[in-house]
Design a protein with these regions (language model features):
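Conserved phosphate/anionic-ligand binding catalytic regions in large, soluble enzymes, centered on
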Residues: 221-234, 238-239, 283-287, 372, ...
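General small-molecule cofactor/ligand-binding pocket signal
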Residues: 85, 143-147, 329, 362, ...
Length: 900
């Protein structure tokens, strides 16, 4: 499209927003209206210090968000009654699939030998959850059996079960006896739980659940037409080596001070690749952070008040509806009522009155209505609901009494255990204190608000403020994903336009926005390929060719999709070895399903043989999957369709400027050629079809889409091309600066790099004993986040400057690395100790530099202020180098009173 100015776009997006109608939604089914506390919205959600940071792999410059995510894990562990929680997954439905996959991978030897492959799912889980389970289980050879948990008989082939609490209709069920039966048969049980209900209800961990998962959306996160929001996942300690997703753990730094870090990373795809327990990479860190702050702000008593008010309102509403002649079918419930209409009441008439009152209700078959109350429901809302139901019954009603505080479910379901008694959940209950706590944590982190983040293959570009502003509009925030079509015309137009733009950019014919991350996009693309092959009688094809340089998510996604991976060598110039590629494609031509190729490659170069590789795959009966992680070097210059690919995924949080959020949210849409369009993901609720459903919501994290839409509309065709050229130019500028010092590991046929470059650090280690990790830690003393460490080549640093950085910032980065180079030279030449030097001891926290005692051979000034400009702008790390081995040997994944 033609580019818009910021002012023109502001007017345009206002017009689109006005086409969305914000009704009061009682649909429920996993999404509920909430109150996002203003200090959290203002100081986290709308604060670039929080939304522009990267996943906290570099712990020393991530202590703030690591602490915030540890708070989240503590909330989840204590509310679920289980000792171990991760720091978020993509959504509730994919968390269900992750639980099933974990159970399958954790089968006993006897179960593996007996080929136990049946998963039981109760019939009263959310429809979207069941759809995603089916999508994810079938390729792994797992049989999904749906039935009534009360009557299901466990047999030796059943390895796991999934139930909902309260169930999809809102009923609180007693699963204790079911779990006893499951355990007796060797099956493990996962419970999909409503997090807010666990404030009042007995935690599933206390009655034997092996996993408890769900959505934390109710903790202050808007509905956003389906997302983003953070899923949670808690389990027993015995699964700590197989739990999916990232875990924050408490460790210590070089001086014994408490420090936080990502724990047990050897489970994850970037290390284990095809043997990983999950393909998940980007999750929902920003939303988990917000949910954690919500719990910090309200504390245990505040949460009890909120949950109690929701439940009391539901109970009061039940009594008043029964006076009007309606019947409530749920004997025990938390917030959701299932109402049977009397014969003389028309469901259509009731819906018509509801819509006139701007109210959305859930409609079941057989004349039943669902009402899910939430945090925002007040006496006026209850009065409107009773007016609707009275009108449909031909009666008058006026609310005359206040809602009494009362419990309406059987006392046996009531929670008796305390939760959130740690200091952090007691200290910050005023806006002033919370604001200062959030600010203190933010100061401990490096984000794009501080300096360039040059992580290779991560594309840490600017998230323009003008693209972020629409997210705070209620017309985008407060829409339920199952709202009627005529209430979401603005979203519909935006989604259709954005899909068309992405198709044009990629050269493809179809697009889905449903995947919630790049890894989810990979899985979706492979699932679409599998469905297509099955449709043409080629379902036996199960081999995926992968270059040795592939992102770890590629092999992990392929295995999750039921494929077998075959690795192709790379030559000494960093290219995929064409002859090895050809030989392995030919050797597997009868079973070749696909090849996954990143372009430019993860080695930072444009593969000159890319088209020939596409032709080879097609000649052998396979499909070409292009990993879009590096699309920032393609947009406007070429595209996957032109090159010859059949499908690609995009990372909106990389190429298209939506924020990384410290580890999510992400969006990983896929675009496909015409022959694959019929196999794109559907949705059971909105479209009545569960083909290849990969996310809980029909459009995934729809709330993020206005960012990318704004980015494309304001840049226009020429602007997008200029972005790509500038990104490549910046990378080559840095390559020219570093080629005579560190050296560049790979360059392309023209002697240039793509949009990223790999710095050679292996020879540095040979000469001085200084390794790439030491360089990464020393960069922190200058206020910089490290480049990508030891990927895709061990012993190197991969740098991607993006188009967003000015020449002045690039030159500052060069100056810093040249300073570090000179420090390395001092070690090589014997001018500095090989053991006690600024690199081996980096980073240097303020408490160390300002201590009375200084034990190092070099001066404090060299440690903290090696360059003059640091006196004007100094970022202080909060901890010294973190002890990773200690943290993994002593996993502490929640706040506790233990001594370190």
């Amino acid at each position: 499209p033609e580019p818009m100015t910021e002012r023109e776009f502001a007017e345009h997006i206002s017009e689109l927003a006005s086409k969305n109608e914000v009704f009061t939604s009682y649909i429920g089914m996993g999404w509920y209206d909430t109150v996002c506390p203003a200090p959290i919205q203002r100081n986290v959600f709308e604060n670039p210090v929080w939304y522009t940071s990267y996943t906290p792999y570099q712990a020393e410059v991530s202590q703030g968000r690591l602490e915030a995510l540890l708070n989240f894990q503590t909330v989840i562990a204590e509310l679920t009654g289980l000792p171990l929680a991760n720091c978020s997954l993509l959504d509730e439905a994919t968390a269900a699939a992750e639980a099933a996959t974990m159970f399958y991978g954790s089968r006993s030897r006897a179960q593996v030998k007996a080929e136990a492959n049946t998963l039981f799912v109760d019939e009263n889980v959310f429809a979207s959850t069941l759809a995603v389970i089916n999508t994810r289980m079938i390729p792994q050879g797992i049989k999904v059996v749906v039935g009534d948990y009360k009557t299901f008989e466990f047999t030796p082939d059943v390895f796991g079960a999934i139930v909902q609490y309260p169930n999809a209709d809102g009923s609180i069920e007693d699963y204790k006896e079911f779990i006893v039966r499951a355990n007796a048969g060797g099956a493990r049980v996962a419970v999909a739980a409503d997090l807010m209900s666990l404030v009042l209800l007995t935690p599933p961990g206390e009655w034997g659940a092996d996993v408890v998962f769900g959505s934390s959306q109710r903790f202050g996160i808007p509905m956003f037409y389906g997302g983003p929001s953070a899923a949670f996942f808690a389990t027993k300690d015995e699964y700590k080596r197989s739990i999916p997703g990232r875990i924050i753990g408490i460790s210590k730094d070089a001086y014994g001070h408490t420090a936080y870090r990502l724990a047990l990373q050897t489970r994850e795809q970037h290390i284990k690749r095809e043997k990983a327990t999950s393909n998940i990479c980007t999750a929902q860190a920003l939303l988990a952070t917000m949910a954690g702050f919500y719990a910090v702000y309200h504390g245990a008593e505040g949460l009890k008040n909120i949950a109690g008010r929701i439940h009391a309102s539901a109970g009061f509403l039940t009594g008043e509806l029964e006076k009007l002649g309606y019947k409530q079918l749920n004997k025990n419930y938390f917030d959701t009522l299932k109402i049977q209409l009397p014969e003389h009441v028309s469901i259509n008439a009731l819906r018509e009155i509801a819509l006139e009152c701007k109210v959305n209700l859930r409609c079941f078959d057989a004349g039943q209505i669902g009402i899910s109350l939430d945090e925002t429901t007040g006496p006026t809302d209850i009065g409107v609901l009773l007016y609707i139901f009275a009108g449909a019954a031909g009666k008058d009603y006026m609310l005359k009494e206040a809602v009494p505080e009362k419990t309406y479910f059987d006392p046996k379901f009531a929670r008796t255990s305390e939760f959130l008694q740690e200091d952090v959940f007691k200290k910050y209950h005023t806006e002033t204190e919370l604001m200062r706590y959030i600010t203190r944590l933010g100061r401990k982190d490096v984000s794009l608000a501080q300096s360039m983040i040059s992580l290779g293959s991560c594309t840490m570009k600017l998230n323009p403020a003008s693209t972020m502003l629409p997210l705070s509009r209620p017309e985008f925030m407060n829409i339920h994903p199952y709202a009627p079509e005529d209430q979401v015309e603005g979203y519909t137009e935006l989604i259709e336009n954005l899909s068309a733009y992405l198709c044009e950019i990629t050269g493809f014919k179809g697009c889905t926005l449903q995947p919630n991350s790049g890894a989810a996009g990979e899985y979706t693309g492979l699932r679409v390929i599998r469905a297509y092959l099955e449709s043409i009688g080629q379902g036996h094809r199960n081999i995926v060719l992968l270059p040795a340089s592939a992102h770890g998510t590629n092999p992990a996604s392929a295995v999750q999709c039921g494929f077998t991976t075959v690795t192709v060598k790379c030559d000494d110039k960093g290219n995929i070895d064409l002859e090895d590629f050809r030989a392995k494609a030919e050797a597997n031509k009868d079973n070749l399903a696909a090849s996954m190729i990143t372009y430019p490659s993860t080695h930072g170069i444009f593969e000159v043989d890319i088209k020939e590789m596409c032709d080879i795959v097609h000649a052998c009966g396979g499909q070409l999957y292009m990993d879009g992680a590096n699309m920032n070097a393609q947009v406007g210059l070429t595209n996957p369709g032109t090159i010859g690919a059949d499908v690609c995924h995009l990372n909106l949080h990389k190429t298209f400027s939506s924020p990384h959020g410290g580890g999510g949210p992400g969006v990983g849409p896929i675009c496909v050629a015409a022959h694959l369009v019929p196999f794109l993901p559907q949705h059971p609720v909105l479209w009545g079809n569960d083909l290849n459903t990969v996310s809980a919501a029909p459009y995934g994290s729809a709330g993020i889409l206005p960012i990318t839409y704004a980015y494309i509309r304001m840049l226009g065709t020429e602007g997008l091309e200029t972005v790509t050229k500038t990104a490549i130019l910046n990378a080559n500028y840095l390559a020219a600066k570093f080629k005579d010092t560190y050296g560049i590991v790979y360059t392309g046929a023209t002697g240039r790099v793509g949009h990223e470059l790999i710095l050679e650090c292996r020879t540095v280690k040979e000469r001085s004993g200084i390794d790439e990790g030491d360089i990464a830690k020393r960069l922190m003393d200058f206020g910089y986040h490290a480049p990508t460490l030891s990927f895709p080549v061990h012993g190197t640093l991969m740098v991607e400057p993006t188009e967003s950085e000015s020449k002045a910032e690039l030159d500052r980065f060069v100056e810093v690395l040249e300073c570090i180079w000179n420090e390395i030279k001092e070690v090589e030449e014997g001018k500095a100790s090989k053991e006690d030097n600024v690199l081996k001891n980096a980073p240097h926290p303020e408490y160390e530099v300002t201590a009375d005692e200084w034990k190092h051979e070099y001066p404090r000034s060299k440690a903290a202020f090696p360059l003059e400009w640091l006196h004007d702008s100094k970022f202080w790390v909060n901890v010294a180098r973190v002890d990773n081995a200690y943290g993994d040997r002593n996993l502490i994944p929640t706040l506790c009173a233990c001594e370190i």
